[in-house]
Amino acid sequence: MFKNLFKIKEREPKEITVVAPITGEIIPLEEVPDPVFAQKMMGEGVAVKPANGEVISPVDGEVKLVFQTKHAIIVEAENNAEILIHIGLDTVNLEGEGFTAHVKDGDIVKVGDKLMSFDIATIEEKATSSITPIIISNTDNVREVKNIKVTEVTAGENQILQVIN
């Protein structure tokens, strides 16, 4: 009798598509020259070798965190997937130099909204690499992450990941 009363209803899976937040060349995560990303310790995803210094929102959602050093941002999609865009490698050490945030924590964004801009020359001169991992940072809390096979992407146009949650 009480079995059905307390049964938690399983929700329907919701799939979202993540578009490229940066224009450039896709790099498989396993080939990123940083073991934290290459070994997927931060989560599943891909990376982009940027062709320009503009980052747009890859999903409709909410800005959860703009890192104080402006080298990374997390946007939460409508299905609760958290997309971490980490601009360059070892860029936290730049302490914000070369980065500009165009949004703040709590902002509601749509695909294509400008999130950040950065100076590629500064990053390539002072950091390890401009390669930018795009990670589902809460991979453990989503049902599935699928990479979409592409080699070159244009920000806001090409799909790079599907996330089912």
Swiss-Prot record:
Molecular function terms from GO: kinase activity; metal ion binding
How does the cofactor attach, per the note? Binds 1 zinc ion per glycerol kinase EIIA-Glc dimer. The zinc ion is important for dimerization.
For this protein, the parts annotated as crossing the membrane are none
- Write out the catalytic residues in the record: 86 (tele-phosphohistidine intermediate)
A single BP term in Gene Ontology: phosphoenolpyruvate-dependent sugar phosphotransferase system
Which InterPro entries does the annotation name?
Dup_hybrid_motif, PTS_EIIA_1_perm, PTS_EIIA_component
Which residues does Zn(2+) bind?
Answer: 71, 86
User: Which PANTHER family does the record associate with it?
Assistant: PTS SYSTEM GLUCOSE-SPECIFIC EIIA COMPONENT
UniProt name for this protein? PTS system glucose-specific EIIA component
Q: Which species is the source of this protein?
A: Oceanobacillus iheyensis (strain DSM 14371 / CIP 107618 / JCM 11309 / KCTC 3954 / HTE831)
